[in-house]
From Swiss-Prot:
Keywords associated with the record: Ribonucleoprotein, Ribosomal protein, RNA-binding, rRNA-binding
GO molecular function: 5S rRNA binding; structural constituent of ribosome
Name of this protein: Large ribosomal subunit protein uL18
Assembly and binders: Part of the 50S ribosomal subunit; part of the 5S rRNA/L5/L18/L25 subcomplex. Contacts the 5S and 23S rRNAs.
Listed SUPFAM superfamilies: Translational machinery components
UniProt entry tagged with the keyword RNA-binding: yes
A GO cellular-component term linked to this record: cytosolic large ribosomal subunit
Family per similarity comment: Belongs to the universal ribosomal protein uL18 family.
Function: This is one of the proteins that bind and probably mediate the attachment of the 5S RNA into the large ribosomal subunit, where it forms part of the central protuberance.
Gene Ontology biological process terms from the UniProt entry: translation
């Protein structure tokens, strides 16, 4: 059985490996996703300028009022819709998806699918 500490270390290694290949540009910024046990966070980042353009998470006041649970796939879908809406307001349509070393299933996949349905292309 893999210990929690080892799992986190393996995820960090996967994330570093992916980050060495993926860069966000002003034309195609990076959608970075982080998943904790209770919440899910998403940011659209321009790596060249080194700044976050838009962000959304289950901690946002806008979503906290709507959600009963913040750690399920429904919450991840809401975050995906919200990040896509905020990106559209800033004129962002195409992005590069950075899963942050997490497996592409469950909450990460739900967030990505909801963002695609709401208009982001990746």
């Amino acid at each position: 059985m893999i210990k929690r500490r080892d799992r986190k270390e393996l995820r960090r290694k996967r994330h570093l490996r992916v980050r060495s290949k993926i860069k966000g540009t002003p034309e195609r910024p990076r959608l970075a996703v982080y998943r904790s046990e209770r919440h899910i966070y998403a940011q659209i980042i321009d790596d060249i300028a080194g700044r976050t353009i838009v962000s959304a998470s289950t901690v946002d006041k806008e979503l906290r009022e709507k959600l009963t649970k913040t750690w399920n796939q429904e919450a991840a879908k809401e975050v995906g819709k919200l990040i896509a809406k905020r990106a559209a307001e800033k004129g962002i349509k195409k992005i590069v998806f950075d899963r942050g070393g997490f497996k592409f299933h469950g909450r990460i996949k739900s967030l990505a699918d909801a963002a695609r349905e709401a208009g982001l292309e990746f």
